[in-house]
């Protein structure tokens, strides 16, 4: 089974990309989703590594957020850059993870990802509202594979 290609349907991926685009219309923040078959690392360490490997730390306001999923491990992590991490309360990432986890446990992976994007978007909108000179600094596509 090709875990990366079969985890989400093409339509589900497009719904995720649409959710990212909608979220980024209201914030200067950047959100990405990355899928990997598996990892032998601790999930938070791997999410941080992938965040940097995808050059998400190059955003002007340090407000990128990565949703990282290791499919075979059935684990995921959310990594926020320094700018957003300094602004949100200490439970924000755990609350977002809990919302996603409930959907994942029900097998609703696309819904869980979209809800994670929406939750992240609300925080980004609050602390990093969209500005007239804002530009999309990172791809909105779901990235896949080992980096």
PLM feature spans:
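A structural boundary signal for the start of the first folded domain, especially the loop/turn
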Residues: 1-64, 69-147
């Amino acid at each position: 089974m090709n875990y990366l290609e079969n985890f989400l349907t093409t339509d589900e991926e497009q719904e995720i990309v649409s959710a990212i685009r909608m979220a980024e219309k209201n914030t200067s923040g950047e959100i990405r989703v990355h899928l990997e078959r598996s990892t032998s690392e601790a999930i938070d360490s791997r999410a941080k590594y992938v965040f940097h490997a995808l050059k998400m730390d190059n955003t002007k306001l340090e407000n990128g957020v990565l949703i990282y999923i290791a499919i075979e491990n059935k684990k995921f992590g959310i990594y926020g850059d320094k700018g957003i991490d300094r602004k949100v309360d200490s439970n924000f990432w755990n609350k977002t993870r809990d919302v996603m986890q409930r959907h994942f446990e029900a097998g609703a992976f696309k819904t869980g990802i979209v809800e994670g994007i929406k939750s992240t978007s609300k925080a980004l909108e609050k602390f990093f509202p969209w500005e007239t000179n804002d530009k999309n600094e990172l791809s909105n596509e779901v990235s896949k594979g080992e980096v």
